[in-house]
């Protein structure tokens, strides 16, 4: 750092000068110095996702489509496979399972339209937009119990009067619970996504037996038959609970999933969830603790040890507490089903457009969880003998799906086609559009006589069939290709839709009235009155 110093005149150098007050002036030059702070570059711009309203034109043509009565019956706790001892093949059907309906729609471009001038097939393509939906539920309201004959229950920690420090080898008991109450409906054109806690990968390889496994949040599609959260959490019980007795039978060897609302709401194109309806209800009925060795010991600083004469309090009991869930009362006043819902504005960028001519409707309804008990006698007896009766357990469900679809068209400009190909490349293939590949710059071989035996076989490989992207997933298929109708007034949901639009639904058949006959006298009288 350079500096310039200017001193005042000193009297010793100038004897003729009278001494005055002298001050020193210091001037310092400012030099540029590089900053130690980080320089942040502007972020990369995010590619803009268009709303379907920007390139989809809606028409004034609406169709009604509805399924038949959808029924399913099975065992509420487990599936019974066919074996040598059992000739029955009973599936697992529980009210605490997801019902994921894959609704297949007809191709509107191959549909018999009332007016062929609606769209230009050379420059436009037709798509369906879901504007109304009603999920009907049959059968009465009821509460179904779940449980385990060997449930891991040690002490009643709600009304306990002694601390049991000594744990026996087996203290399991027969416990039943009424699970968490859930009503759910998710509508989208792709399968919904669920999340659950699973077993992760440990960082250290020398893990000892009995160490707590790491947890990992896993996201996977929700399939038909997957279990919902029943009050014990969304987790993989088969891999995280080795004793098979910490939860009821219906979930002790399966995975309970919870809808990934955050992930589906943040999805760029908004295909998996147009909208959703949800109602959850839960409270803790009983409080207990678990039997087993304490994996995480309670620190000594958190309690004062008891004396050996204090009635068993010298050793603390299990501190792994767990409640038994309860969904409480079910009532028709809080039902989400058997009523119409109209889609005006979806939560994402897809405003109800059914890409690939399909729709996914995910339903959960635990308010109709009644488990039917069937009793069959093995032999006739004059007196009651419980050993001469067989008890069976079954659960049945009834559904009805109704929709209102609006006919829409997409103008295939080069920009829109490029955008649709980026979003879903199979859409253009379904619409018989292909991409022209750029010419190759390398030299290729072309034989003249293709059928000659002197050259290698020139038979082209057979074209691969289009693969279903959801072929490995399990859904309840509902085919509505032959169930579309323009007569909205002939169906329950169609009449409700017309009432929303303010359109009358009365019949247009007019009653013919016979005109009254006029006599010549009346006509003459009228002519007479007109004379002046």
Curated annotation (Swiss-Prot):
Region (Disordered): 512-532
SUPFAM superfamilies in alphabetical order: Group I dsDNA viruses (SSF88648)
Subcellular location, record wording: Virion; Host nucleus
GO molecular-function terms, A-Z: structural molecule activity
A Pfam family that the UniProt record links to this protein: Late_protein_L1
Subcellular location, principal: virion
GO biological process, one term: endocytosis involved in viral entry into host cell
Listed GO CC annotations: host cell nucleus; T=7 icosahedral viral capsid
Keywords for the protein's UniProt record, in alphabetical order: Capsid protein, Disulfide bond, Host nucleus, Host-virus interaction, Late protein, T=7 icosahedral capsid protein, Viral attachment to host cell, Viral penetration into host cytoplasm, Virion, Virus endocytosis by host, Virus entry into host cell
Domain of life: Viruses
Subunit structure: Self-assembles into homopentamers. The capsid has an icosahedral symmetry and consists of 72 capsomers, with each capsomer being a pentamer of L1. Interacts with the minor capsid protein L2; this interaction is necessary for viral genome encapsidation. Interacts with protein E2; this interaction enhances E2-dependent replication and transcription activation.
Record's function text: Forms an icosahedral capsid with a T=7 symmetry and a 50 nm diameter. The capsid is composed of 72 pentamers linked to each other by disulfide bonds and associated with L2 proteins. Binds to heparan sulfate proteoglycans on cell surface of basal layer keratinocytes to provide initial virion attachment. This binding mediates a conformational change in the virus capsid that facilitates efficient infection. The virion enters the host cell via endocytosis. During virus trafficking, L1 protein dissociates from the viral DNA and the genomic DNA is released to the host nucleus.
Protein family (similarity comment): Belongs to the papillomaviridae L1 protein family.
Descriptive protein name: Major capsid protein L1
Organism per entry: Human papillomavirus 3
Lineage of origin: Viruses, Monodnaviria, Shotokuvirae, Cossaviricota, Papovaviricetes
């Amino acid at each position: 750092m350079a500096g310039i110093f200017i001193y005042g005149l000193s009297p010793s150098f100038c004897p003729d000068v009278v001494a005055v007050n002298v001050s020193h002036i210091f001037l310092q030059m400012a030099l540029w110095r590089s900053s130690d702070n980080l320089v942040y570059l502007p972020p990369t711009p995010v590619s803009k996702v268009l709303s379907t309203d920007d390139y989809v034109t809606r028409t004034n043509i609406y169709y009604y489509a509805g399924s038949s009565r959808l029924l399913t019956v099975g065992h509420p706790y487990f599936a019974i496979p066919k074996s040598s001892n059992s000739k029955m093949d009973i599936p697992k059907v529980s009210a605490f399972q997801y019902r994921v309906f894959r609704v297949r729609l007809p191709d509107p471009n191959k549909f018999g339209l009332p007016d062929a001038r609606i769209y230009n097939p050379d420059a436009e393509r037709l798509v369906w937009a879901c504007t109304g939906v009603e999920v009907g539920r049959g059968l009465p309201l009821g509460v179904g119990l779940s449980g385990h004959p060997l449930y891991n229950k040690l002490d009643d920690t709600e009304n306990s009067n002694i601390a049991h420090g000594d744990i026996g080898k087996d203290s399991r008991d027969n416990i039943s619970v009424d699970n968490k109450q859930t009503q759910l409906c998710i509508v989208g054109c792709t399968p919904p996504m669920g999340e659950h806690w699973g077993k992760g990968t440990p960082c250290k390889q020398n893990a000892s037996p009995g160490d707590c496994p790491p947890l990992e949040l896993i996201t996977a599609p929700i399939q038909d038959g997957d279990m919902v959260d029943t009050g014990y959490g969304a987790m993989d019980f088969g891999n995280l609970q080795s004793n098979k007795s910490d939860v009821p039978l219906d979930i002790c060897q399966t995975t309970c999933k919870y809808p990934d609302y955050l992930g589906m709401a943040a999805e760029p194109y908004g295909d998996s969830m147009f909208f959703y309806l949800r109602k959850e209800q839960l409270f803790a009925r009983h409080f207990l603790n678990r039997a087993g060795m304490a994996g995480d010991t309670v620190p000594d600083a958190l309690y004062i040890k008891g004396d050996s004469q204090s009635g068993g309090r010298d050793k603390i009991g299990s501190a792994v507490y767990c409640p038994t869930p309860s969904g409480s009362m079910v009532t028709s006043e809080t039902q989400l089903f058997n009523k119409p819902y109209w889609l005006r504005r979806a939560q994402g960028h897809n405003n109800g457009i059914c890409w690939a001519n399909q729709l996914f409707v995910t339903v959960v309804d635990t308010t109709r969880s009644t488990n039917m008990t069937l009793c069959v006698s093995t032999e006739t007896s004059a007196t009651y003998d419980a050993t001469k009766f067989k008890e069976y357990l079954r659960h049945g469900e009834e559904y009805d799906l109704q929709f209102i679809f609006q006919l829409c068209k997409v103008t295939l400009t080069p920009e829109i086609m490029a955008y649709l190909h980026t979003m879903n490349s199979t859409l253009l293939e379904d619409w018989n559009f292909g991409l022209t590949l750029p010419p190759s710059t390398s030299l290729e071989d072309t034989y003249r006589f293709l059928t000659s035996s002197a050259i290698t076989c020139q038979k082209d490989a057979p074209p691969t069939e289009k693969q279903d992207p959801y072929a490995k997933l399990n859904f309840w298929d509902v085919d509505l290709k032959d169930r579309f109708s323009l007569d909205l007034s002939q169906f329950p949901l169609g009449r409700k839709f017309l009432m929303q639009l303010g359109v009358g639904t009365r019949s247009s058949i007019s009653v013919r009235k016979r005109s009254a006959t006029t006599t010549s006298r009346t006509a003459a009288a009228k002519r007479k009155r007109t004379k002046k």
